[in-house]
Amino acid sequence: MTGGAQELLLSRIRDVPDYPQPGVVFKDITPLLADPEAFSVLTEALAEVCVRHGATKVVGLEARGFILGAPVAVRAGLGFIPIRKAGKLPGATLSQAYALEYGTAEIEVHAEDLTPDDRVMVIDDVLATGGTAAAAMELIRRGGADVAGLAVLMELGFLGGRARLEPTLAALEALLAL
């Protein structure tokens, strides 16, 4: 991705201080999504990552990973699979629990959506601690598919997600490092 494309994306991400709690600066991507040029640049860049790494399907993580992953899959000519919070998918699912700062959470996928022939690219808006991404990759592997990698719009490097994920991940690409 060119420097001009990165500048465009950065210019459309709004910092919201003290949200969702005091001391946190939330990275709001809604201005980027509202700008068709910026959203197209983002979609194209993530689709190129999928193609370059030989992905056959795209997984989007609830919730903003859905917003990014579905158009990326269409642009790359790939299928899209949502990974959702527990209890949100009907029918048979595989689930994976993971630790949060205070407690645990669980995500699910439809087992029949993954096959041994699949190379799955996980798409999300941000890489922070890597907990959700690690759980998603474990879930994909348990479903019998291969993980092609993780691609995100932005990485919050100070939270250590890359160090947590790199030992078990073939590819980890962040379009923006913040």
Swiss-Prot record:
HAMAP family: Aden_phosphoribosyltr. Pfam families: Pribosyltran. GO terms for molecular function: adenine binding; adenine phosphoribosyltransferase activity; AMP binding. The lineage of its organism: Bacteria, Bacillati, Actinomycetota, Actinomycetes, Kitasatosporales. Its main location: cytoplasm. It catalyses: AMP + diphosphate = 5-phospho-alpha-D-ribose 1-diphosphate + adenine. The keyword Transferase applies. It comes from the Bacteria. One of its GO terms (biological process) is adenine salvage. The keyword Glycosyltransferase applies. It is found in: Cytoplasm. Pathway: Purine metabolism; AMP biosynthesis via salvage pathway; AMP from adenine: step 1/1. Catalyzes a salvage reaction resulting in the formation of AMP, that is energically less costly than de novo synthesis. Gene3D superfamilies: 3.40.50.2020. This is Adenine phosphoribosyltransferase. It is an enzyme of class 2 (transferase). Its EC number is 2.4.2.7. GO terms for cellular component: cytoplasm. Keywords: Cytoplasm, Glycosyltransferase, Purine salvage, Transferase. Homodimer. Belongs to the purine/pyrimidine phosphoribosyltransferase family. InterPro entries: Ade_phspho_trans, PRibTrfase_dom, PRTase-like, UPRTase/APRTase.
